Amino acid sequence: MKSRCQKGDKDLSLRVALYIKYNNGKRKMINLQKTDDVRINAINELLPPIAHLYELPITDKAAETVYQTRCEIADLVHGKDNRLLVIIGPCSIHDPKAALEYAQRLLPLRKKYEKELLIVMRVYFEKPRTTVGWKGLINDPHLDGSFDINFGLRQARSLLLELNNMGMPASTEFLDMITPQYYADLISWGAIGARTTESQIHRELASGLSCPVGFKNGTDGNLKIAIDAVGAASHPHHFLSVTKTGHSAIVHTTGNPDCHVILRGGKEPNYDREHVQAAVAQLAKSGISTKLMIDFSHANSCKDFTRQMLVAEDVAAQIQAGENNIMGVMVESHLEEGRQDKPEVYGKSITDACIGWDTTEEMLALLAKANQVRV
């Protein structure tokens, strides 16, 4: 009787254990359904960076273009070169063919003014949004809401490779911790925008980027957040990202000594002599490089693309008057002036309005002439 009872107890224990295991598992599944990914519609696999780097490897010519330009920009940031850095190009790239034509037109001017200007093409693939809208070539390369990001990343790298192979260095804005692994080796200068300058993640990112980086003042005109960002990015950081093979990883950086601030305006423009000198004083007090860049667009142009030339004229006059702390400028320029909602006109922006090619040539001539006093 005792033995049967022991056997029965064992059977009962097994049944109870299985019951508890089953019910706990079921309960866990129900809980996960209630708490995990409740607002995720779908998750699609992304090709790892190495797939694109293997298919589109950097060439010797492209590497030379990037390395040389990075060194030259670093010299500008630290006052070892008196040329003026000009970051110029479309607000955002939506048509690689038009971008290449723009580069082919810009290349002779880069050569023509190489003693006065260091011209780097603006090649922005991601568009930060205040609310919603098209987020750029990487996010939606077909402009149809299909969000073919794998194709967008490949297209971005392909364009950058072609630009650098022709000797045209590229600049871009960095928005996250993952996309730089796909094409940062082809970027000569990077920007952290006004909406992300105060973000700890972006300061950490800048500390590990291999290129010089500019931080814009805040959208309200606050310069201190950009100054703090430059200081933070110069130090080592430790953060989460992915490896070239796509694995989650902890990244340890050395710090980036080649960062600077960008004046882009805020509640009012901040490109004039008074604002520049006030910014220089703030930079000096903070103990970082007093060399700064001026964005001709955004709040400095009051969001009127035609005013970019007025800003250029003011900055050119400051340079001719002996202002040595303006080390660079940013210009939104395209083949055709203005903007459009849909890509109907070739070479015209579908995001922020840009100056056209004729005005671009005039502006570069103006800036080169003004900077002759420094070189």
Predicted regions and their residues:
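Conserved, mostly hydrophobic/aromatic
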Residues: 89, 294, 356
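Intrinsic-disorder-associated, low-complexity terminal segments enriched in Asp/Asn/His/Tyr and depleted
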Residues: 9-11, 19-23
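Active-site-facing alpha/beta catalytic cores
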Residues: 30-35, 116-271, 275-276, 298-299, ...
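Glycine-rich anion/phosphate-binding loops
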Residues: 94-111, 147-155, 313
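Internal helix-turn-beta structural module
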Residues: 333-371
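Conserved phosphate/anionic-ligand binding catalytic regions in large, soluble enzymes, centered on
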Residues: 85-95, 352
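N- or domain-start disorder-to-order transition segments that initiate the globular core
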Residues: 40-77
